[in-house]
Amino acid sequence: MKETPEHYPTPEESIATMVTIDDTALVFEGGGMRNAYTAALVSRLIAEGINFPHVSGVSAGSSHLCNFTSRDAQRSHDTFVDLVEDPEFGGLKHFRKGHGYFNAEYIYQQICYPDGALPFNMDAFLANPA
C-alpha cells in the first residue's frame, strides 16, 4: 500500500493519549465504497486520541469499527482508499466468475493475516475497552 504523507499514530501511541467520550456510542454506517469518505473521519478520531465506550458498525462500517477499535488509522485509510488498486480487490473478472463484483474472501479474510496486504492488529483490537 502507498504511504500517506501524514504520520498516523501507532495503535500504542493512540491508546496512550486516549480521551473517552462517556455516554456516547459511535456507529459507523454501511455504504460500500462511500465509506472512503468516512475513512478520513476514522483516521482523524484515532489521531486525536478520541474513544467511545461503545462502537458499532453495519456492513462496510464494520471495517471502520475494526480499524477504529484496533486504533489503526493507516489501515483505516488504506482499506478504502488504496486497496481498490489491488487487482485482487474485485472487478469484472470476479463478477464473470459468479463471485460478485468485490472479492469478499480477499477483502475480509486474506488481507488481514500477518503476511496479508493489510495485516490486522488483533491484540490492539482486543485490548480496546469499547
Language-model features and meaning:
Residues 22-24, 129-130:
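A generic secondary-structure signal marking the coil-to-beta-strand transition
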Residues 95-99, 125-130:
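Short, glycine/charge-rich beta-strand/loop segments that flank catalytic centers
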Residues 114-129:
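A short alpha-helix-loop-beta-strand transition element characteristic
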Residues 16-18, 47, 124-125:
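Structural motif
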Residues 23-24, 32-115:
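Patatin-like phospholipase
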Residues 1-23:
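Small-residue-rich anion-binding loops in enzyme active sites
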Residues 12-14, 42-43, 118-121:
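A generic local structural motif
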